[in-house]
């Protein structure tokens, strides 16, 4: 089942074009370009986004062409519809808006900042099932802690996502 061009086109014209809305129009599709953190950052600073969610076979290609819809893929897999993918898409964007997170500084050190995955996290107790929190994290030396976190981020990225390290913007 493919969503017909005239139905979707009328909806777009009634809601976006008629109101001179400057929001970006996005269609979540496995054919689209991969969605990355940098895209979430771009959308979080835009005038908003409207999402088209196809179902089963998607939407008529003419809608994509006529309304300059940006096709975005949420991963290398296929879902029955774009609704579930839209939750992840929106969450990645909304969490970057001012006031959404309690500590906005934490955004700077999480996965994909500097094209690195995030370092390991630890809580109390200091030892659990014979595994101890690394001594450097208990040292109070913030410079050494930052260095350890950076090293661990690089190790984890090399192991799980070496493709991220190929980007020339990554600082080892």
Regions found by a protein language model. Name each.
Residues 1-3:
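Short, small-residue-biased leader/transition segments that mark boundaries at the very start
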Residues 5-55, 60:
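S-adenosyl-L-methionine/SAH cofactor-binding core of RNA-modifying enzymes
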Residues 10, 14, 88, 92, ...:
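Alpha-helical scaffold segments in soluble metabolic enzymes
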Residues 50, 71, 77-78, 126, ...:
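Short glycine- and Lys/Arg-enriched binding-loop motifs that mark or flank ligand-binding interfaces
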Residues 59, 63-110:
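Structured adenosyl-cofactor binding patch, chiefly the S-adenosyl-L-methionine
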Residues 84, 96-135:
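Internal, active-site/partner-interface "lid" segment
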Residues 126-172:
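SAM-dependent methyltransferases
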């Amino acid at each position: 089942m493919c969503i017909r061009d005239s139905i979707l086109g009328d909806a777009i014209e009634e809601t976006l074009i008629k109101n001179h809305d400057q929001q970006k129009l996005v269609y979540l599709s496995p054919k689209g370009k991969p969605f990355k953190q940098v895209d979430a950052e771009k959308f979080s600073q835009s005038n908003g986004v409207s999402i088209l969610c196809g179902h089963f076979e998607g939407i008529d290609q003419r809608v994509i062409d006529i309304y300059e819809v940006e096709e975005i893929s949420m991963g290398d897999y296929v879902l029955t519809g774009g609704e579930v993918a839209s939750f992840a898409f929106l969450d990645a964007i909304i969490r970057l808006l001012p006031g959404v997170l309690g500590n906005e500084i934490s955004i700077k050190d999480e996965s994909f900042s500097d094209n690195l995955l995030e370092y390991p996290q630890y809580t109390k107790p200091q030892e659990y099932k014979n595994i101890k929190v690394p001594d450097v994290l208990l040292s109070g030396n913030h410079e050494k802690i930052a260095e350890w976190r950076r090293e661990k981020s690089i190790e984890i990225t090399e192991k799980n996502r070496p493709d991220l390290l190929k980007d020339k913007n990554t600082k080892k």
